Amino acid sequence: MERIIEKAIYASRWLMFPVYVGLSFGFILLTLKFFQQIVFIIPDILAMSESGLVLVVLSLIDIALVGGLLVMVMFLGYENFISKMDIQDNEKRLGWMGTMDVNSIKNKVASSIVAISSVHLLRLFMEAEKILDDKIMLCVIIHLTFVLSAFGMAYIDKMSKKKHVLH
């Protein structure tokens, strides 16, 4: 009976597969939004101010960072929780695939969130005259919370690896 339960629990990991497929659809939508922004900016590019262009570029960077985060979560989640990806051509296999554990994934996600938050904060600062000080302060506090969380997670991971080596 125990063996059947263990097999059922182990097989249930495949329930995550539709989640990763859904994330790939989210990535497609994000890609469409990226190119939509480029297409809509082209007619206005010559009349646009430098700061306006920087804001558009920051939006594109933001989308690229979120897209990278999605790809990382899809690939690493699939490889760590469902099945190893069988990519025959090692030259096409991404260098980090198959080498990251769950803690490494969490640290990568946390640093990606900090990068995304940094872009949002920079965009906010560029439009600071239009935004209430309270909102800016709240965004800075949220960003600092992300930064401290990322540092905390990295520190805990480092300590747990060091402790594991000592034992």
Curated annotation (Swiss-Prot):
Specify where it is mainly localized: membrane
Q: Which NCBIfam families match?
A: HI0507
Q: Which residues cross the membrane?
A: 15-35, 53-73, 136-156
Whether Metal-binding counts among this entry's keywords is no
Family membership: Belongs to the UPF0114 family.
PANTHER family cross-referenced by the UniProt entry: UPF0114 PROTEIN YQHA
Lineage runs: Bacteria, Pseudomonadati, Pseudomonadota, Gammaproteobacteria, Enterobacterales
Record's subcellular location: Cell membrane
Under the heading Pfam families, the entry gives: UPF0114 (PF03350)
Q: What is the protein name for this chain?
A: UPF0114 protein in repA1-repA2 intergenic region
Claim: S-adenosyl-L-methionine is one of the keywords in the record:
no
> According to Swiss-Prot or TrEMBL, what is its membrane topology?
Multi-pass membrane protein
Q: Which InterPro entries does the protein's record reference?
A: UPF0114, UPF0114_bac
One GO term of the cellular component aspect? plasma membrane
User: Listed disulfide bonds for this chain?
Assistant: none
Q: Which UniProt keywords apply?
A: Cell membrane, Membrane, Plasmid, Transmembrane, Transmembrane helix
